[in-house]
């Protein structure tokens, strides 16, 4: 969970973007990074493998205020979407404060979405987390594609608990910051509860 840096008076929170391969996790993070003021963000780190990559960076949003005199710094991570990188996904989930599940809206990716969501549940449970109890939002990405299923179908397949959900077209930024703000607010609410 979050850790406190007393010398800089910052609470550090980890948000992980999770989802199947090529659903837009990396595109989300790159868009956020490119639109975040240079003085509020760290370096964008990319760990590449032959077929996938993990991105992460941290930033200090100025608009979210303070909690008990501490600023909140968010560390954003993507997980590799390919199934054979499951050990990496588990490692990246360690210490998570909030999750964005990025779903690919294309009809042919619905099964991959459902498998990835179940994989998220399992990997969180193995580390003592419950997806029902941590800050969590869903992003339905690639809404602009002609083969995108309806939001109702996405909801029926992926959002049984009626958690916050957002439509997105990550390359153009549609829905990207709405999704991030939603999960950040949920994380801050948990922090204020002392959770």
Curated annotation (Swiss-Prot):
Amino-acid positions noted as binding GTP in the UniProt annotation, renumbered to this chain: 19-26, 78-82, 141-144
Gene3D superfamilies in the record: P-loop containing nucleotide triphosphate hydrolases
Cellular component terms (Gene Ontology): cytoplasm
SUPFAM superfamilies in the cross-refs: P-loop containing nucleoside triphosphate hydrolases
GO biological process: regulation of protein localization
Record's keyword terms, sorted: Coiled coil, Cytoplasm, GTP-binding, Nucleotide-binding
One example GO MF annotation: GTPase activity
Primary subcellular site in the record, as a coarse category: cytoplasm
PANTHER family for this protein: ATP/GTP-BINDING PROTEIN-RELATED, GLIDING MOTILITY PROTEIN MGLA
Entry's family note: Belongs to the small GTPase superfamily. Arf family. MglA subfamily.
Protein name: Mutual gliding-motility protein MglA
């Amino acid at each position: 969970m979050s850790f406190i840096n007393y010398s800089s008076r910052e609470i550090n929170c980890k948000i992980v973007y999770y989802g199947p391969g090529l659903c837009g996790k990396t595109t989300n993070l790159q868009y956020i990074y490119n639109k975040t003021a240079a003085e509020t963000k760290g370096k964008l780190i990319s760990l590449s493998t032959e077929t996938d990559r993990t991105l992460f960076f941290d930033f200090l949003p100025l608009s979210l205020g303070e909690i008990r005199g501490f600023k909140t710094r968010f560390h954003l991570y993507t997980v590799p979407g390919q199934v054979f990188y499951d050990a990496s996904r588990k490692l990246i989930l360690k210490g998570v404060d909030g999750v964005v599940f990025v779903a690919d809206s294309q009809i042919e990716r619905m099964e991959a979405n459902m498998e990835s969501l179940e994989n998220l549940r399992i990997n969180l449970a193995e580390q003592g987390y419950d997806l029902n109890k941590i800050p969590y939002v869903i992003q339905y990405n690639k809404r602009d594609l002609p083969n995108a299923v309806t939001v109702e179908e996405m909801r029926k397949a992926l959002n049984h608990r009626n958690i916050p959900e957002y439509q997105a077209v990550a390359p153009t930024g549609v829905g990207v910051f709405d999704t991030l703000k939603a999960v950040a607010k949920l994380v801050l609410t948990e922090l204020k509860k002392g959770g």
